[in-house]
Amino acid sequence: METIAKHLDVCQEQLLELYEENSNNLTKHIQHWKCIRYECVLLHKAKQMGLNHIGMQVVPALTVSQTKGHQAIEMQMTLETLLNSDYGMEPWTLQDTSREMWLTAPKYCFKKQGQTVEVKYDCNADNIMEYVSWKYIYVHDTDKWVKVTGHIDYKGLYYVHGGHKTYYTNFEKEAKKYGNSLQWEVCIGSSVICSPASISSTVQDVSIAGPASHTSSSTTTTLAQASPALPTCTSEERVDPPPCKRPRGPTTNTNNARDTVSVRHSDSVDSTNNNIYPNSYNSNKGRDNNFCTATPVVQLQGDPNCLKCLRYRLHAKHKTLFVAASSTWRWTCSDTSSKHALVTLTYVNEEQREQFLNTVRLPPTVTYKVGYMSLQLL
């Protein structure tokens, strides 16, 4: 047991040094996965010997350490092939080479420089989902890596490799999941892309509302594939009425019918829907600031293994700067699919917490929030 504990301490110390170094060198990240692989081997052997704890660390079940070890081997071998490619000398962060990123859509590819894309389903501002469009995607093709660029159109997020367009997010499938109709709007920065269903619905509404002399006119709408930098719904003329909502009050000008329809740019303002309402969730009135009997806490968030190593180091080197540290935990009722775990630290008072934050250097992959715990600790 002492031999395993000694080797485990050395392994976790190396992991902490790699986290704190936050290198952009791919060889460092290969070393990181080698350490995780070795750690899993030690924990697997300890469990086979009947050990449930090594120091303060709980020894996981055999299947857990075995599965995580296999994942570490996969990541190590994949990164080694990437190192030998044309892109091995590019800057790579620890987040770029994490397993979470590896399994993020598009799966089994490395990604860089993501941009948030908002999709509004059913033209409802309260039904918005966020996705990530990647600028660069590294695809493994047989025996080599290929670097391609990501694109966006009304159908979804995709990349082109070998003349084949591969969608890794399909907005129509997402609309069936999150919406009640096959209508959606894609917002990228200041540009808006609309689904064909949204455009046809808009054309029909405007034609009915127009004068009788224009109902038989032909309607032309052009939809272009878009890049994040340019508006993508264009046409010969522009119409002010919004595509998804009817005016709430009577219109004063009935002589402005148009023969063609375009989807409005996100910078345009609809005068009939320009009211601003206060956000009741942001109101601080009546807030109870009576924290005099509450316990100051810091909640750490990050990779479970990183948090375990950090907690071990805190107990070893900074145990006078906090009172207690929880085990790693997660919210069980959360709707998110985040793999991050949490660790809660408690303090005697705010001064001790402030001293902790000013003294302890947290790894770049760990974030924190400060707060209070109203329950008394036993």
Swiss-Prot record:
Post-translational modification: Phosphorylated.
Single Gene Ontology MF annotation: DNA-binding transcription factor activity
Biased composition (Polar residues): 250-259
Compartments in which it is found: Host nucleus
Chief site of localization: host cell
Example of a GO biological process term: regulation of DNA replication
Alphabetical UniProt keywords: Activator, DNA replication, DNA-binding, Early protein, Host nucleus, Phosphoprotein, Repressor, Transcription, Transcription regulation
Residue segments, region Disordered: 209-282
Domain of life (superkingdom): Viruses
GO annotation, cellular component aspect: host cell nucleus
Transactivation domain: annotated span: 1-200
Keyword Phosphoprotein recorded: yes
Record field: compositional bias (Low complexity): 209-232, 273-282
DNA-binding domain: annotated segments: 295-378
Pfam hit, one: PPV_E2_N
Similarity comment: Belongs to the papillomaviridae E2 protein family.
Assembly description: Binds DNA as homodimer. Interacts with protein E1; this interaction greatly increases E1 DNA-binding activity. Interacts with protein L1; this interaction enhances E2-dependent replication and transcription activation. Interacts with protein L2; this interaction inhibits E2 transcriptional activity but not DNA replication function E2. Interacts with protein E7; this interaction inhibits E7 oncogenic activity. Interacts with host TAF1; this interaction modulates E2-dependent transcriptional regulation. Interacts with host BRD4; this interaction mediates E2 transcriptional activation function.
Task of the protein: Plays a role in the initiation of viral DNA replication. A dimer of E2 interacts with a dimer of E1 in order to improve specificity of E1 DNA binding activity. Once the complex recognizes and binds DNA at specific sites, the E2 dimer is removed from DNA. E2 also regulates viral transcription through binding to the E2RE response element (5'-ACCNNNNNNGGT-3') present in multiple copies in the regulatory regions of the viral genome. Activates or represses transcription depending on E2RE's position with regards to proximal promoter elements including the TATA-box.
UniProt protein name: Regulatory protein E2
Gene it is expressed from: E2
